[in-house]
Regions:
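Fungal secretory targeting signals
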Residues: 1-20, 279
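Substrate-binding/charge-relay-adjacent region of secreted/lumenal peptidase catalytic domains
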Residues: 19-99, 109, 114-392, 396-423, ...
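Short, glycine-/polar-rich solvent-exposed loops and beta-turns at beta-strand/coil boundaries
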Residues: 101-104
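Active-site glycine-centered loops adjacent to acidic/histidine catalytic or metal-binding residues
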Residues: 387, 513, 581
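Polar, glycine-rich mid-to-C-terminal structural blocks
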Residues: 418, 422-466
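An often Trp-containing, charged/polar helix-loop segment at the C-terminal end
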Residues: 431, 467-470, 478-480, 525, ...
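Membrane-proximal ectodomain caps of single-pass cell-surface receptors
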Residues: 436-439, 501, 529
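C-terminal substrate/ligand-recognition segments
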Residues: 491, 512-530
Length: 598
């Protein structure tokens, strides 16, 4: 995620802009539309308890992850709920031959004339059409569920959304590129002090004690989430030749294109190029898979990726949100339909993009967070950058709910979801012969490790003790409402995110950001999974409970802070803190721990 970039990662934060109300017009009552009934999810609490059990190394059920199809079966609606909704539709005169039940998605779809749908949903509910985009939606959007089915149904929405408008690219965060002062000399990693100017792959391996890889288990490619920012293979070849000569020329990610996205081309910000250059030298000879998604100017993130790796998500809880997610076909772009369940997800996925929580709806965040839980239940490790603007989030602070004249801290999603591992950033300082890893602090680029507390997601049990210990000893005593003390706390860990060697457009520069740290940590986990698979074990899966139970596998980061919103932010301190999480990994100890687990 970026922020400072000496090129870097994009903190993908876009703000969705509402279309003028005058562009929305009522649809004719005779037009037939497709509607969707989203069932209640009574097993969500049960699913979370199951995840906490099978990811707890002290549990007898540790590692008993489910197949994705088993997860889908777990969430299907009850037979009684299905029968009640079908009876409601039949009583309303709906032709049941038009009904399609997506059990794994907990959604039932049906066709109805607009006039009849309005009567079914109650007075004042209309189907609206947007002349500019071709989209359809129900208004009011917060209409009530009919009383006959309110105990079984979460909400009812449209199952179709047309779009013919042309998308326009915009970026909320602009990267900064730092060039190295000439003449640039490749540092010799036998002494880390030689690495202070530019951290090459060899320097990074030396810092964390990572040996070169020698083996590659089958079906263990590391996943990278790509987001409309292509890379040039020529840059990779030059980077391998200069900084990772053990990687052969021509080595590049396996591309899984989603909804027509292009993976190779002229970079926009260089984010995906950075992800590849940070991860490949650690995972090689394992491979890297790029799940390439198109840029989304409507403000949402990653739903198209989740659709592509889990068909049930396409319609889960009413499907993707047309207010935030693209709809197909796109004028001048991908003609659709949107991909559903086309690819198998990798054991590890690294995500260097994020969005301010406050720019998304609560439903959007909760729906997607449930899907990250489903992937965790199936044994997938998801690593997400925590952000590069300290407690600010990406673009701006939010408003204090207790005092509108004061600001409040912001968090980034999806790192604020408790079912992913959020990664912060550090830098290395040298005092004489001493190497000291501290929280990144770069006022020049306004780059500070993203951290704090979610305003949308509750604090999970696995981190409550660590958070309570931190606040008991380091309470910043900010005004009430400055941060959500009961929210999911981030980050979980932190790694080097400053002055990393980066090559783009044939030029070696330095880069940074939590988007540099995240693929590094993901690559470490992928390496460890490789050893587990070769030993006949399963991938390690959801990491967070293990990490919080084993502070001995981390270097505790106790110096630094993450200012923002006209405050000093939080301070790094002993134990977990909302700047560096549990600290930076001691790879040999982390490897020994994770390989030893059943």
């Amino acid at each position: 995620m970026h922020c400072y970039a000496t090129v870097v990662a994009l903190l993908g934060a876009q703000i969705a802009t509402a279309l003028p109300q005058s562009q929305w017009k009522a649809v004719s009552g005779d037009e037939v539309v497709r509607a969707a009934v989203a069932f209640h999810q009574p097993k969500l609490a049960e699913a979370e308890a199951l995840l906490m059990d099978i990811s707890d190394p002290s549990s007898e059920k540790f590692g008993h992850y489910l197949e994705l199809r088993e997860v889908q079966e777990f969430f299907k609606p009850s037979d009684s709920s299905q029968k009640k909704v079908l009876q409601w539709l039949e009583d309303a005169g709906i032709d049941l031959s038009s009904v399609h039940l997506r059990k794994a998605a907990a959604v039932l779809e049906f066709s109805a004339p607009v006039k009849k749908l309005g009567k079914m949903l109650g007075a004042g509910v209309h189907v609206m059409h947007n002349d500019a985009t071709g989209e359809l939606r129900l208004e009011p959007t917060d209409h009530a569920v009919p009383s006959a089915i309110e105990d079984d149904v979460e909400f009812i929405t449209l199952a179709q959304s047309k779009k013919t408008g042309k998308t326009k690219r915009s970026r909320a965060v602009k990267p900064v590129i730092d060039t190295l002062p000439p003449p640039y000399k490749l540092p010799v990693a036998d002494d880390l002090r030689n690495c202070s100017e530019s951290w090459t792959p060899a320097c990074i391996r030396k810092l964390y004690g990572i040996p070169l890889g020698t083996k590659a288990a089958k079906n263990n490619s590391m996943g990278l989430f790509g987001y409309g920012d292509p890379y040039q293979p020529a840059d990779l070849n030059q980077f391998w030749a200069k900084h990772a000569p053990f990687i052969p020329k021509g080595t590049k990610p396996k591309v899984k294109s989603i909804n027509g996205a292009e993976a190779e081309g002229v970079p926009v910000e260089g984010e995906e190029l950075l992800d590849i250059e940070m991860s490949y030298p650690i995972v090689y000879p394992q491979t890297v898979t790029m799940f390439q998604t198109p840029y989304n100017n409507k403000g949402g993130l990653a739903n198209d990726f989740l659709d592509a790796v889990d068909a049930s998500y396409c319609k889960y809880d009413g499907g993707d949100d047309p207010d935030f997610d693209p709809t197909f076909p796109v004028f001048g772009g991908f003609q659709g339909p949107a991909m559903c369940g086309k690819y198998k997800v990798t054991n590890v996925v690294s995500i260097s993009f994020a969005i301010d929580e406050q720019t998304l709806s609560r439903r959007y965040i909760q729906r997607q967070c449930h899907e990250w839980m489903k992937l965790a239940l199936s044994g997938v490790s998801v690593l997400v950058a925590s952000g590069d603007r300290g407690v600010q989030g990406a673009t701006q602070c939010t408003v204090n709910p207790y005092d509108a004249n004061k600001s409040a801290f912001n968090s980034l999603f999806p790192g604020s979801c408790p079912y992913v591992t959020a990664v912060g950033a550090t830098q290395v300082n040298f005092t004489g012969s001493r190497t000291n890893e501290v929280a990144v602090f770069d006022p020049k680029h306004n780059f500070y490790s993203g951290g704090g507390f979610s305003n949308m997601n509750a604090q999970p049990a696995y981190q409550r003790k660590a958070v309570a210990n931190y606040l008991a000893a380091n309470n910043p005593h900010y005004p009430k409402g400055t941060y959500n003390i009961s929210g999911r706390a981030i980050p979980d860990v932190a790694l080097l995110g400053a002055n990393v060697t980066f090559l783009q457009d044939g030029k070696t520069t330095i880069s940074g950001g939590t988007s540099a740290a995240t693929p590094m940590f993901a690559a470490m986990i992928n390496r460890i999974n490789d050893e587990r698979l070769l030993a006949g074990k399963k991938p390690i899966g959801f990491l967070n409970q293990i990490l919080y139970q084993h502070p001995e596998v981390f270097t505790d980061i106790t110096q630094g802070s993450n200012p923002g919103c006209d405050t000093a932010g939080f301070k790094a301190a002993k134990g977990w803190d909302p700047v560096s999480g549990m600290g930076s990994p001691k790879y040999p100890k982390l490897r020994d721990l994770l390989v030893s687990l059943p």
